[in-house]
Curated annotation (Swiss-Prot):
Keyword list, A-Z: Cell cycle, Cell division
Function statement: Prevents the cell division inhibition by proteins MinC and MinD at internal division sites while permitting inhibition at polar sites. This ensures cell division at the proper site by restricting the formation of a division septum at the midpoint of the long axis of the cell.
Signal peptide: none
The keyword Cell cycle is assigned to this record: yes
Gene3D superfamilies recorded: Cell division topological specificity factor MinE
Tagged with keyword Metal-binding: no
Gene Ontology BP term (one): cell division
InterPro entries the record matches: MinE, MinE_sf
Name the record gives this protein: Cell division topological specificity factor
Residues forming coiled coils: none
Similarity annotation: Belongs to the MinE family.
């Protein structure tokens, strides 16, 4: 039925969207907040690949850091851009 809804262009109700978001949050919470983020090195490599398409950068100029404080997680990405030539 959802495939038919997709073809007909029916929009999801706000209840369905909220349910999907809650499921994502619960899955994240259940996966273990204390576990080390093993996806950060791959994320950094992919960021280097994407940014390198547009700007010539050194891979060491991109830093990815995950910080946890109580119930809040902050993903910080620092990108040092090359100086623009005059």
């Amino acid at each position: 039925m959802s495939f038919l809804s997709f073809l007909l262009g029916q929009k999801k109700t706000s209840a369905v969207v909220a349910k999907e978001r809650l499921q994502i949050i619960l899955a994240h919470e259940r996966s273990g907040r204390g576990a080390s983020p093993d996806y950060l090195p791959q994320l950094q490599q992919e960021l280097v690949a994407v940014i390198s398409k547009y700007v010539n950068i050194n891979p060491d100029d991109i830093k990815v850091h995950l910080e946890r404080q109580d119930t809040l997680e902050v993903l910080e990405v620092k990108i040092e851009m090359p100086q623009k030539e005059a």
